[in-house]
Amino acid sequence: MKNLRLFALLAFLLLAGKNTMAQTDLEALMATRGEYFFSLPLQQREEAKRLTRLCSVDKLEGNRLICYANEEQYRQLLAMGYQPMLLMPPSMQEHYAMWDGTNREAYDWDAYPTYEAYQDMMKHYAEDFPERCTYFDLGTLASGRKLMFCRFNNGDPDGKPKFLYTSTIHGDELTGMMLMLRLIDELCTSNDPRILALLDQLDIFISPCTNPNGTYHGGNNTVYGARRNNANDADLNRNYPDFDNGPHPDGKEYQPETIMMMELAEQYPFTMAANYHGGSEVLNYPWDTYQPLHPDDEWWQLVCHEYADLTHEHDTMYMSGFDNGIVNGYVWYPIYGSRQDYMNYYQQCREVTIECSIPYTPNPSTMPMYWTYNHESMLRYLEQCLYGIHGRVTDSVTGAPLEAEVTILTHDHHGSAVSSHLPAGDYHRPIKGGTYEVTYSCEGYYPKTLTLTVADWETLVQDVQLVPEGYGVEEGGPSAPLTGLVIYLNPTNGVLFVEAQNFASLQNQTYRITNLMGQTLLTGNITAETQQINVSSLPQGMYFITIAGETRKFVVR
């Protein structure tokens, strides 16, 4: 396997050399494509920040940037005095074996599917395995091509974490597309208990190609000539709202593909996601746009190292750069408008960018090798969606599920808090092992804060009931005085305080706490001007306290 990888890299380098052309010829070629691929020397890191606003910086290699630009961007760079070194487009360095969809049983994942074969595969999986898989698309582009998905669960997705795997937002980065198709095949056909457990416990969405116009730019029967950008010359991974650089950081309107994906994220509250790219071998975790660390930076390093470390069991040189296969996006090079940052900040979804091959458009004969490298890591990343703190939030009176905010105190910010969602009221919070103060809050309900401890690779189920505001409390609020008697905190989660304006009249009086059935649960005497009564032994619910003939209602939460 290592020899095969070495062969693939050598072939990539040789083909790049073989296809070297004069700069004038390359410029003419790229003008016909409307997309330029080039390198720029980098003198200072600050220059990368400036250039990422002028073109699509794809990666930083030593002291040079590898970039893409559309016609307008390229002319602007030239006008500003930059001298790009044009490079052969990745998808034009060789001709690629294509599969037209015939003889599916003999297909060995070593040729790229034509568009029609890709579409047929997606639909046939759902038709052949309806108990596991459903097919849907997000809509039809002007070209007639679709953004297609397969969705996997056991037929009962409510209350389960939702997971999103996608690839090829850049049309010429095809390794991830093939990994996604093969994972779809495994989820449909395998009866391994591990796969069945994933189908039972998760609601999984997979889209192998989210930029089909870029991938099949040269026509539906080939990926030769595939482009990074979409049909409107837009880099889709710079086209999302950016919390630090505004709603349109690329200066373009939201593209049809972007709108479709944002609508999907609004409809389905994904817990975790990954988006596969090519051109490097590294897991790029948040943020891309922002230097301060993500609140869950330690968790991100944990799960990213797990992914990369598992690939090293097959080849220690694969995903070995940076911090042993992982990198903070901003530390590598900043970009603005990435889907990763959009999903993390705006959609409360932990999404990572996985760069899975140095060649952008590898020879498809190497695809089985990349599957071997990534297979276990892909399953482990899916399973990470099951760890952390999970549960349901419901109304303490009616039992109805609630849409509540679940916030880790002194920890969450920049969109890292999660929510519970209807119809089940379920929430899912992946987090690094530790002890946390977790607050559950919902409009119209008293908040509740719990101290929870969870370990790495552990699942903690914590269901929570919230008490409606004003439930069982007299008009005027829970601490409104009546003939000088005041009780607080109300609701309480442990200690009830009783005060009287005229302590002498209450001193040594007996208090009695009863439930809704009238049963006496606690009694005692008033012995202090501010009497503390321990009610931590009482279950959640509404109670009455009676002192000297006066009765107050209170709630234990």
Give the residues covered by each predicted segment.
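Bacterial Sec-dependent N-terminal signal peptides
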Residues: 1-29
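C-terminal outer-membrane/trafficking sorting elements
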Residues: 18-22, 477-557
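Active-site/substrate-binding loop(s) of hydrolase catalytic cores
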Residues: 142, 157-305, 313, 317-320, ...
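Active-site-adjacent mobile loop/cap segments within catalytic or ligand-binding domains
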Residues: 272-295, 325-383
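A short, amphipathic beta-strand motif
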Residues: 389-396, 464
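Short, acidic Ser/Thr/Gly-rich low-complexity loop/linker segments typical of extracellular
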Residues: 400-432
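A short, solvent-exposed beta-strand micro-motif common in secreted/extracellular proteins
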Residues: 433-444
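Structured interaction patches on ligand/partner-binding surfaces of diverse proteins
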Residues: 443-469, 556-557
